[in-house]
């Protein structure tokens, strides 16, 4: 923020979530067309030409829509990894996840059960997670002030060598699988 004191205040998740909440609330109530336009009509009356009054109302509506468009409303997850066959692939044993969370309710984000770095003024988060060999279903949760889940998303990340041949059909003969290499069951497997 341009104002250091305001920046320090907004860096507190409990303050930032209330800021986002009230910003949205004001846009939905006081600055809604239903409430603001009668106020403009009452205050301006016949003092300004109708075109100027309409311009004021149009400006207020556009400003309101812009403000609402700046408020993150959904939990998003980005991996920065290449995607193949429906999975993200990582050669590394760690992956960095990032995204946004619902700004008006979120005070913390967890990635795979661990606290993510939460940048409250932007409703943005980032986390480094450890991957096991094979398919990792990573759970990201946005939490409110009481620790309740607000939203959740999954990211499926494959770590290590991809299976040479996805399994998923009828087994017609004996098969021996070991933990030395990950297996991917892509279709129903009939034994």
Question: Whereabouts are the PLM-identified features?
Answer:
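Low-complexity, disordered linker/stalk regions enriched in Pro/Thr/Ser/Gly
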Residues: 58-191
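Middle-to-C-terminal accessory/interaction subdomains
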Residues: 1-94, 99, 170-171
